[in-house]
C-alpha cells in the first residue's frame, strides 16, 4: 500500500477478499477472515490516511447469512442462477428458485432387441426389446461423461434413463415406458417438465460433481 501511495499515477479504486469457508454452517472461520480484512482496512485509513472507495468480500453464502460483510458491494455468483452455494447454507432466509433450464431434442428413435448393446464399450446390453432415443448432446458440450448409465432426462414429463456411455456429441436414453415419443420431441436435461424436475444439485450428485459445474 505504501508503494502504491508513492506512485501518484496509480489510483486505488477498491479492495476485496474472498471467503474460504462462508458456505459452511459453522461461520467461525469466515467471521475471523472478515475481522482480519476489516482490521487491515482500518489500519490503512488510520496509519496511512488512505480511504479506499469500494470494499467488498461477500460471496453468495455471505450475502445470504452474513449481512454485516456486505460492505459497499457484493458478488452474487451461484445465487444469480437461483441456486444455493452448499447444503449447509440456510434456505429459509432467502428462498431461491432455479433460473436456468437446458433443453435439447430427439434426433433419432429405434428399437433394439434383447442381446444388443448401446454406445461405446457395450456397457449397456438390452435384456428385452427396448426403445432408444438419441440426444445430440455430449461431453464435448459439457454434459458429463460420468452420467453414463446413471443420469436421466425428461421427455413428455417422464424420466428417460441414459443407456450406456455418454459420447462426445450424443447419448442414448430408454424411451420404452414413454408412449408416443418421436424424433423432434423436446428433451429436458436440466429443469422442469410436467411434474418432474432435474436439478443441478441432483446432476452433481449423480455425476460426482457439484452444482457450480452445471451452470
What is each of the regions a protein language model found here?
Residues 1-105, 109-113:
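Active-site loop/helix belt of alpha/beta enzymes
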Residues 111-215:
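C-terminal accessory subdomain/extension
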